[in-house]
């Protein structure tokens, strides 16, 4: 199976060698092009030199011009050639040599978008939220599932995903809308509304770990709140119950594992998420 790979980079001098190694060791796929959109920083020249020596493709973006949607859209429109494009972020670590094969195999003209399983190796709250949001069973979602699932029907991730490029081009990708987050969710809703399916591929795994401070978490959810206000097409889908369900899931699992740091952190963590989201929605109105 022939694929292209897109991996946006920022200040990636220390990671670039391992990123390329992990991509090139993938099995059962023929990698046609590896494309690195590079947001300019002080170490960009060294990163670009390494990319050139590795025979990969790149283009540069000024920091003030970067957007999650437009940068990926440019890669798809102007640089990719294969029907299937795997997108991955620089902090998603691929340990399984068949990860790209699993996620690329899930994509076709009827299922034009798929996202993989993310694993956190830090025993923090994210460890449990990953377990909840990225289960052990692969599944597909289509329009008939939306009423039951609500906002979760459009859950998606740009950390590790695959696109069927012919349809992406045909329907206009992210519609040339600049987005600093959730472009994957925007696209998932778009294809489901048009009668296509999205897929979650549990066999396609990456390690993707964070350890956000409460301030960082608040800012992240503040930005999410702003985004949802700017995209009112999501207003009709309930999300409160899923948030409460996630909090109770983390509490139960942390209690079962006697994870005291997580139990102490849980209330301020969830409060930071809630207040950030609420403030973001209020400010942007």
Predicted regions and their residues:
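Conserved donor NDP-sugar-binding/catalytic core segment of glycosyltransferases
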Residues: 97-128
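Non-catalytic, C-terminal membrane-associated alpha-helical segments of glycosyltransferases
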Residues: 219-226, 230-231, 236-285
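Short, flexible, basic/aromatic active-site loop/helix in glycosyltransferases
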Residues: 133-154
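Acidic donor-binding loop at a coil-to-helix junction in glycosyltransferase catalytic cores
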Residues: 180-187
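Glycine-rich, basic loop-to-helix element that forms the pyrophosphate-binding segment
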Residues: 62-80
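Acidic donor-binding segment of Leloir-type glycosyltransferases
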Residues: 23-60
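Short, well-formed alpha-helical segments that are part of the catalytic scaffolds
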Residues: 12-25
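Short beta-strand-to-loop acidic/aromatic patch adjacent to the donor-nucleotide binding site
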Residues: 82-93
């Amino acid at each position: 199976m022939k694929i292209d790979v897109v991996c946006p980079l920022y200040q990636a001098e220390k990671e670039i060698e391992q990123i390329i190694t992990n991509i090139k060791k993938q099995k059962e796929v023929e990698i046609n092009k590896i494309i690195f959109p590079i947001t300019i920083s002080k170490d960009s020249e060294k990163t670009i030199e390494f990319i050139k020596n590795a025979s990969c493709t790149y283009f540069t973006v000024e920091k003030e011009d970067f957007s999650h949607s437009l940068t990926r859209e440019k890669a798809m429109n102007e640089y990719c050639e294969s029907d299937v494009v795997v997108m991955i972020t620089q902090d998603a670590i691929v340990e399984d040599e068949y990860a790209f094969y699993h996620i690329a195999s899930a994509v076709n003209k009827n299922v034009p978008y798929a996202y993989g399983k993310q694993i956190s190796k830090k025993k923090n709250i994210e460890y449990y939220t990953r377990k909840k949001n990225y289960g052990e069973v692969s599944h597909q979602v289509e329009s008939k599932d939306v009423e039951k699932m609500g906002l979760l029907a459009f859950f998606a991730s740009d950390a590790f995903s695959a696109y069927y490029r012919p349809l992406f081009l045909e329907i206009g990708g992210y519609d040339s809308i600049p987005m600093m987050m959730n472009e994957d969710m925007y696209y998932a809703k778009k294809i489901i509304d048009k009668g296509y399916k999205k897929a979650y591929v549990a066999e396609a795994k990456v390690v993707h770990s964070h350890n956000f401070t409460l301030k960082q978490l608040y800012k992240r959810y503040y930005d999410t709140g702003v985004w949802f206000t700017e995209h009112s097409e999501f207003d009709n889908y309930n999300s409160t119950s899923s948030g409460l369900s996630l909090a109770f899931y983390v509490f139960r699992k942390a209690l079962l594992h006697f994870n005291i740091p997580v139990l102490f952190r849980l209330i301020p963590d969830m409060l930071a998420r809630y207040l950030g989201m609420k403030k973001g929605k209020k400010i942007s109105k």
